[in-house]
From Swiss-Prot:
Segments forming domain HTH lysR-type: 1-58
Keyword terms: DNA-binding, Repressor, Transcription, Transcription regulation
Record carries keyword Nucleotide-binding: no
Domain of life, per lineage: Bacteria
UniProt cross-references to CDD domains, sorted A to Z: PBP2_YofA_SoxR_like (cd08442)
Name of this protein: HTH-type transcriptional regulator SoxR
Length: 289
């Protein structure tokens, strides 16, 4: 059994199709078919339920998937350990929620000091980013409002104040709470805070409108479509320009902490260690939780 076979197997699982897996790997379809058949012959069992609609794992396939993920993760870690050196190089994939206002200064300081590292930044909501870290898809992530997890180490980066923003500058505060709530999809900590506040008010029936980017949410608020909550530091310039109005919300919902997380069992490459050091050396000192 070869590592390559396990990688091909995982791609077939991901796409549910030999042809799609082959295309993603730049292999001919017949080669992928042969490698899957070879794997099944070695294990003396079929791994998929096959139909005209695609390929779905059977119970034996699910078992192999679990172990293959661990094996490939360990191989990747081994390569990182062997290749790691005093001058970090290679790649680092970091996730972040969209509203980490202080992130650019951290990334800039890191890139200036370690220019050989290929740093990729992936944006998403907290719940998705946590899942990606747990599933080894990201080396680490900046997330908000997170709680302790046995497989994750987290560092507190900074605490921020959430505020409600609107362009309804002539409306009383009580009327604002019935305007549409402009939010990210489920899994966003800001959305959870806003919905929790609205829910606790009891008599509020606000419409929920989901958006994909913070830029779109802010543009919609400015256009008068609805209201949202956002870190005060992110919106201060727009407030100064007079295009939005800020309202304080109850302290129970206004405090939110940004943390940097990584898996507890992942080998800390020099690249990741130096990234954590850069976070700690930022004006807002990170501390391990």
């Amino acid at each position: 059994m070869e590592i390559k076979d396990l990688q091909i197997f995982q791609k077939v699982v991901e796409y549910g199709s030999v042809s799609k897996a082959a295309k993603s790997l730049n292999y001919v379809q017949s080669y992928v078919t042969v490698r899957i058949q070879k794997l099944e012959e070695e294990l003396q069992t079929e791994l998929f339920h096959r139909s005209s609609r695609g390929m779905v794992l059977n119970s034996e396939g699910k078992t192999l998937l679990f172990y293959s993920q661990n094996i490939i993760s360990m191989v990747d870690e081994m390569i990182k350990v062997v290749q790691d050196c005093d001058n970090p190089a290679g790649s680092l994939e970091i996730g972040t929620v969209e509203t980490v206002n202080k992130l650019p200064s951290i990334l800039s300081a890191y890139h200036k000091k370690y220019p050989k590292i290929d740093l990729s930044l992936i944006t998403g909501v907290t719940e998705d980013l946590v899942d990606d870290v747990l599933n080894y898809k990201l080396d680490g992530a900046f997330v908000t409002g997170y709680y302790n997890h046995p497989q994750i180490i987290q560092y507190e980066v900074f605490e921020e104040e959430l505020v409600l923003i609107s362009n309804y500058d002539k409306l009383p505060f009580e009327e604002l709470k019935n305007k549409p709530l402009l939010v990210f999809k489920q899994g966003c900590s800001y959305r959870a805070k806003l919905e929790g506040w609205v829910r606790d008010e009891g008599e509020i029936n606000a419409k929920i409108m989901e958006f994909g980017t913070m830029e779109t949410i802010l543009g919609s608020v400015i256009a008068g479509l609805g209201i949202t909550i956002i870190p005060k530091s992110t919106i201060s310039l727009l407030e100064a320009e007079g295009v939005v109005r800020i309202y304080e919300i109850p302290e129970k919902y206004s405090k939110i902490t940004t943390v940097f997380i990584h898996r507890a069992d992942t080998f800390l490459t020099n690249a990741l260690q130096k990234f954590i050091e850069t976070i700690k050396n930022a004006p807002e000192t990170a501390r391990k939780l």
